[in-house]
């Protein structure tokens, strides 16, 4: 090898060191070409194959749904692309709503700590070189002084290291707090929390997005800022220091710089080619975690029904299936990380270490600024080269570690892309639902030539059912003018309702199951949109809805009566505990005050109170809020008839207009008008004559009881005819009627 370098140098008139540097560059270039060529060729083949596949199946990219004016496409998987940066910039507006914020303060402190750590690293690298030089020169006094300096600098260095971790956690917590505050404000505005589940189908598990997704996104952003800012600064400062050191010693930094750039570039290309789609994998993992949590919460919410049916085996299989899907996804991620980290460690630990030794050796070997050639200065020469080598090695190790963290961060960036897509999608859905834009998910079947599996796409209701109706708040009366009842799925339950309920009127609403009775209450409460017509109704504070199963909130007994008011709201309205006691007397519920330990008793009220007590608590809330209109949806079905009648009479006496859904004839006398649905889209609104309706009801029950025995009598008659071998007169008449 030496003869070859000498011959090449003599022919082109290069120095031996110049020939060695050029030879090293050529070897590195050849190695990089050998490494990158198969990867690039593979990528080009995949790209060409993808284009051919796209040309062969042009209809697979876009899927059109019948009755939809908009072409709907499947969502692209999250990745580091233009969409990712666009979503991140949109979320930045939430994280930093203005220039001077708490988050900005923590970010500045974190940046100062990162910059301080970089300068400390450079200073420690130089100090290490001086310590090694003092050892080589056999100067114990100098060694002790330098060692003391090294120990003294360790105090601020360790503090800065601890501060970096502390500030990173504080920054992540500040980001999470900002996102949670904004999410909660949007989630509880305009009843979005209801509509995002019942009217929209894009978010399967909002609780997952509001908790874990926001947490993981905040931690990932803060960690990436730390893992990218400091390494980039380290690379810049260490490179500048190394170049300055090499130049001051008379060595050329071009060769090592080119080698470093080539190695880093080759490593980046290899890692990018080998990197799995971590963004898509992490997003799918988060989705499966959310579904597993949903299955658990579903069991908890229906635990009594499952126990009655003894359905524990079915539910256990569902849980096991959901957990297995999550475990399979986690195993897939772990297996892909195994091979990716192996390749990453090989390139960054061993390939970079060998390249680093070459980069450090070349400037020191070729440098002319050391005292060389004189016998009296041999010791100085050795110590200076040792110091330069140690300092350069430490600086290079610091720079290599920084580049390694930058390149390793690509995997974390792809994971951040998954969290960013989920959090951004959550805010996007919340905003659209708040503005009355709903989209539901439909499953369509592709043609057999493309796929045998159904593709899930989003069907915007706004394309099929435009919301053209108007809702106008008025002080008096409820008026429906051509208002249809349409479910979130787009089914028309009743068409063009027209009725008017004035103050002092009491409306009874009847009809078979699924005819639209409760749906009408959802429209009046603003939960469902008015697709056509005009709805005049009082403001929400003048209407109060009581369901069949009232919600029991967390808190004291007092909180149950005044829900959703707080104690301060109660005092502002002028209520006292004595007033609440009178309300409980009205609904025959005062005994629970003594039974449960007073107004300040805190319990899990949904388990403490019986079904009838919970329904009476719902009626107590009505007397507390004193609305103009009360929407009663089978709210006293578990209350005895005598107590139920007293409550309704007290409500009428309090001046509350009742809109009641009930099947009990005993309550008809408390109403003045009737809205009856026929279950086929028809309806009628009329004044209620209780006496006539009760008479008709009694006649209906009498006929039902008489006709109930006819099938048994007919069966017995047939048996007697067979035994006697005779025909029945009724059969003869029936046959004659059929013949004629």
Swiss-Prot record:
Residues 1-218 are annotated as: Interaction with PEX19. ATP-dependent transporter of the ATP-binding cassette (ABC) family involved in the transport of very long chain fatty acid (VLCFA)-CoA from the cytosol to the peroxisome lumen. Like ABCD1 seems to have fatty acyl-CoA thioesterase (ACOT) and ATPase activities, according to this model, VLCFA-CoA as free VLCFA is transpoted in an ATP-dependent manner into peroxisomes after the hydrolysis of VLCFA-CoA mediated by the ACOT activity of ABCD2. Homodimers. Homotetramers. The minimal functional unit is a homodimer but the major oligomeric form in peroxisomal membrane is a homotetramer. Forms heterodimers with ABCD1. Forms heterodimers with ABCD3. In addition to tetramers, some larger molecular assemblies are also found but represented only a minor fraction. Interacts with PEX19; facilitates ABCD2 insertion into the peroxisome membrane. It catalyses: a very long-chain fatty acyl-CoA + H2O = a very long-chain fatty acid + CoA + H(+); a very long-chain fatty acid(in) + ATP + H2O = a very long-chain fatty acid(out) + ADP + phosphate + H(+). The keyword Flavoprotein does not apply. It is found in: Peroxisome membrane. One of its GO terms (cellular component) is cytosol. This is ATP-binding cassette sub-family D member 2. It comes from the Eukaryota. It is a multi-pass membrane protein. Glycans are attached at residues 190, 227.
């Amino acid at each position: 090898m030496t003869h070859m370098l000498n011959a090449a140098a003599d022919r082109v008139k290069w120095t031996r060191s110049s020939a060695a540097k050029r030879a090293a560059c050529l070897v590195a270039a050849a190695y990089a070409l050998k490494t990158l060529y198969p990867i690039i060729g593979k990528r080009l083949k995949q790209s060409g194959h993808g284009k051919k596949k796209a040309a062969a199946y042009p209809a697979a990219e876009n899927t059109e749904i019948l009755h939809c004016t908009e072409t709907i496409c499947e969502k692209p998987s999250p990745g580091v692309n233009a969409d990712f940066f666009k979503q991140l910039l949109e979320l930045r507006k939430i994280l930093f709503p203005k220039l001077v914020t708490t988050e900005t303060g923590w970010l500045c402190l974190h940046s100062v700590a990162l910059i301080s750590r970089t300068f400390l690293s450079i200073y420690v690298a130089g100090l290490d070189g001086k310590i090694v030089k003092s050892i080589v020169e056999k100067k114990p006094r100098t060694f002790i002084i330098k060692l003391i300096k090294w120990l003294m600098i360790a105090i601020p260095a360790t503090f800065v290291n601890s501060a970096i971790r502390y500030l990173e956690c504080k920054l992540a917590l500040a980001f999470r707090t900002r996102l949670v505050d904004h999410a909660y404000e949007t989630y509880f505005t305009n009843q979005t929390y209801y509509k995002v589940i019942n009217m929209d189908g894009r978010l399967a598990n909002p609780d997952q997005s509001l908790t874990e997704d926001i947490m993981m996104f905040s931690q990932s952003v803060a960690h990436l800022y730390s893992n990218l800012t400091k390494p980039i600064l380290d690379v810049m400062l260490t490179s500048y220091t190394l170049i300055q050191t090499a130049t001051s010693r008379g060595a050329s930094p071009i060769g090592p710089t080119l080698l470093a750039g080539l190695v880093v570039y080759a490593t980046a290309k290899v890692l990018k080619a080998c990197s799995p789609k971590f963004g898509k994998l992490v997003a799918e993992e988060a989705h499966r975690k959310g579904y597993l949590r949903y299955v658990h919460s579903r069991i908890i919410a229906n635990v009594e029904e499952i126990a009655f049916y003894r359905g524990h085996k079915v539910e256990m299989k569902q849980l096991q299936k959901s957990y297995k899907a999550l475990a399979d996804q986690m195993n897939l991620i772990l297996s892909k990380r195994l091979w990716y980290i192996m390749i990453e460690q090989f390139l960054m630990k061993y390939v970079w270490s060998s390249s680093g030794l070459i980069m450090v050796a070349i400037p020191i070997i070729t440098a002319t600024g050391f005292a060389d050639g004189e016998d009296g200065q041999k010791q100085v020469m050795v110590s200076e080269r040792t110091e330069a080598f140690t300092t350069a090695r430490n600086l290079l190790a610091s720079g290599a570690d920084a580049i390694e963290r930058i390149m390793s961060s690509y995997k974390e960036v792809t994971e951040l892309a998954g969290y960013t897509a989920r959090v951004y999608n959550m805010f996007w859905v919340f905003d659209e639902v708040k503005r009355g834009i709903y989209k539901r998910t439909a499953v369509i079947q592709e043609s057999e030539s493309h796929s045998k599996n159904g593709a899930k796409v989003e069907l915007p209701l706004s394309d099929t059912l435009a919301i053209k109706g108007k809702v106008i708040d008025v002080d008096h009366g409820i008026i429906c003018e051509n208002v249809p009842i349409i479910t979130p799925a787009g089914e028309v339950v009743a068409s063009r309702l027209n009725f008017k309920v004035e103050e002092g009127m009491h409306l009874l609403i009847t009809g078979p199951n699924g005819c639209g009775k409760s749906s009408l209450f959802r429209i009046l409460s603003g939960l469902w949109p008015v697709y056509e017509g005009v709805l005049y109704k009082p403001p929400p504070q003048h209407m109060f809805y009581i369901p069949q199963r009232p919600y029991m909130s967390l808190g004291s007994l007092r909180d149950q009566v005044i829900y959703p008011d707080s104690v301060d709201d109660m005092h502002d309205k002028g209520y006292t505990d004595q007033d609440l006691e009178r309300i409980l007397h009205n609904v025959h519920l005062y005994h629970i005050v003594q039974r449960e330990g007073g107004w300040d008793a805190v319990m899990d009220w949904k388990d403490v109170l019986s079904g009838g007590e919970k329904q009476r608590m719902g009626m107590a809330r009505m007397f507390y809020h004193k609305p103009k209109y009360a929407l009663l949806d089978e709210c006293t079905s578990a209350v005895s008839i005598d107590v139920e009648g007293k409550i309704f009479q007290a409500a009428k006496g309090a001046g509350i207009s009742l809109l009641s859904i009930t099947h009990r004839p005993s309550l008809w006398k408390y109403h003045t008008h009737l809205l009856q649905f026929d279950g086929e889209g028809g309806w009628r609104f009329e004044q209620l004559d209780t006496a006539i309706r009760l008479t008709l009801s009694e006649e209906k029950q009498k006929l039902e009881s008489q006709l109930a025995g006819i099938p048994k009598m007919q069966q017995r008659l047939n048996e007697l005819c067979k035994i006697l071998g005779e025909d029945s007169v009724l059969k003869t008449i029936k046959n004659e009627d059929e013949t004629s």
